[in-house]
Amino acid sequence: MLSTAAYRDPDRELVMGPQGSAGPVQMRFSPYAFNGGTVLAIAGEDFSIVASDTRLSEGFSIHTRDSPKCYKLTDKTVIGCSGFHGDCLTLTKIIEARLKMYKHSNNKAMTTGAIAAMLSTILYSRRFFPYYVYNIIEGLDEEGKGAVYSFDPVGSYQRDSFKAGGSASAMLQPLLDNQVGFKNMQNVEHVPLTLDRAMRLVKDVFISAAERDVYTGDALRICIVTKEGIREETVPLRKD
């Protein structure tokens, strides 16, 4: 028979008195939930890719198998969000509203770099009650080159060539470091990354992640940003 003595429910905590005696059981509400999922972005010379799985889960329950974590912001910019799904939806709605206001005021779309700076201020304004979201913005910059911006929950951000975030990021980031960044490798020719090779790499790493991470799976949604616009591609992943 399995023992439940070591199990601890974070929302139902036993409070001890001053002499170590057991006090009343208190119910504590947590405003956050972790809904899993993984996002990944790669920037090339004239393209950028952001990809995510479509599984939305909590603990050992799957809420839906069709919940992509990539959101189109402009014709040249896409954001990938993972973490607490409620915060993902709220944050993307705020960004979309700000982009509409900017377009009406300036008669042009906001650039990818400006969107990244705007998101940084939005996240910093909520630093005392932050959004439980890992954000990656990818798109094309003013020169038409691929750009990837990664953020922490309170607004610090930097531009990268590739980045992974979410539940399987610990597995994906070393693969990107090796295959895209050629880090810690000797006597290796640094070949420029092509769109075809980047697509194959994204599919391979997500298939591998779905084998090991219970929060990643069902399907892979890929958004490819080029000067022609944004196109999407869907690849099935394992569903167990």
Swiss-Prot record:
The modification Phosphotyrosine is found at residue 149. The gene is Psmb1. PROSITE patterns: PROTEASOME_BETA_1, PROTEASOME_BETA_2. Induction: Up-regulated in prefrontal cortex (PFC) after nicotine exposure. Down-regulated by theophylline (THP) and 1,3-dinitrobenzene (DNB), two reprotoxic agents thought to induce infertility. The modification Phosphoserine is found at residues 61, 67, 161. It comes from Rattus norvegicus (Rat). Belongs to the peptidase T1B family. The modification N-acetylmethionine is found at residue 1. Non-catalytic component of the 20S core proteasome complex involved in the proteolytic degradation of most intracellular proteins. This complex plays numerous essential roles within the cell by associating with different regulatory particles. Associated with two 19S regulatory particles, forms the 26S proteasome and thus participates in the ATP-dependent degradation of ubiquitinated proteins. The 26S proteasome consists of a 20S proteasome core and two 19S regulatory subunits. The 20S proteasome core is a barrel-shaped complex made of 28 subunits that are arranged in four stacked rings. The two outer rings are each formed by seven alpha subunits, and the two inner rings are formed by seven beta subunits. The proteolytic activity is exerted by three beta-subunits PSMB5, PSMB6 and PSMB7. Interacts with SERPINB2. Interacts with RFPL4A. Pfam families: Proteasome. This is Proteasome subunit beta type-1.
